[in-house]
Amino acid sequence: MKLRLLNMILSMMNKTNNNNNNNINNKKLLLKNMLLDMNNKRMNNMKTMLKNNNMNINNKLQHLNNMNNWNTQIYNYNKNMEIMNIMNDKLINKLLYKMMTLKLNNMNINKIIMSKTINQHSLNKLNIKFYYYYNNDINNMNNNNNNYYMNMMNKLMNIMNNNMNNSLCNILSYYYNKKVTIESIKLSYIYLNSDIFSKYISLNDMNKYNNGILTNYQRMLNNIMPKLNDHNISMNYINNINNINNNKYNNMINLLNNNNNNNNNNNNNNNNYIDNINNIYNNMTIDNIPMDILMYKYLVGWSIKFKGRLNNNNGRTSTTNLLNGTFNNKKYLWSNINNNYKLNYIPSNHNLYNNSNINKNGKYNIKVKLNFI
């Protein structure tokens, strides 16, 4: 692609500037500087990619999405304050869990499933973000109880985020000595967050799956999970990336044509021209594509691992694995062998969570793994 672009640039220069040696020399010098700058940027990108690949060697969580690695992002300006903030974050997490666990007739009913909080600390502000899912399937409750839960949820959200002095945000600001905001995000589907997904599975009655956990859980998951078509999703994803990169190259060629048709070849125009080329080149990488267009939108693979003693008749622990879709987002698996992009890869975004629970048969563990593209 780059050789073809270079040949097109040289051919256009030769056609438009055959009779003017000075302009040709200026164009060649400009082209040389532009290509050197592009080559330096490409080398820097290669070094970054090589460094990232070396970091993933002998790592079980290869290509793990960095967005899911942390629960607390803190500005480390004082060691004692850092420890106090971490302790406060854990207390706030427990407080929110208690608030989201509603009671009906003096019984705890996990109608609202909440994920772990994500705390983003800055010098003068704290943002607490968490996801929650309103579960309508547990205990087959009637409409009056559902209305009760929805009414309580509205009151909870008002307590957290209103501007009154007794709101939870204002109360927490006294303990943190900074502004506190709470960002609650309601999920329409349980598979959008692995933490909520694993809790949803563990909240179901595990005892009724003693006589064939694999078949019963597959039947249950088929009703709530999307019908995956990872091949078409990945193909569309790759085609969108290729189309965007082709548009970048076409914009670069159009700039070259406009510059050749322009008779004013002063230094200011040349500098603006180089800046435009640099801006286009900086936006060519996959990492700079806006997330709202392509990234983290489609679930292409999920797996669930059960480990523990779930049956009274079995004295040994058993392990059951459920897998659907794919966890490998390599481009060359779906693209043509002669594709110019076959050596690149799309970083997979794995979302992992472990949840342990105890029933009357013993202790068991549920591990959920989701792959988004």
Curated annotation (Swiss-Prot):
Q: What is this protein called?
A: Small ribosomal subunit protein uS3m
Arranged from A to Z, the UniProt key words for this protein are: Mitochondrion, Ribonucleoprotein, Ribosomal protein
Organism per entry:
Saccharomyces paradoxus (Yeast)
Query: What's the superkingdom here?
Result: Eukaryota
Q: Which family does it belong to?
A: Belongs to the universal ribosomal protein uS3 family.
Q: Which GO terms describe its biological process?
A: translation
Where mainly located? mitochondrion
Record's subcellular location: Mitochondrion
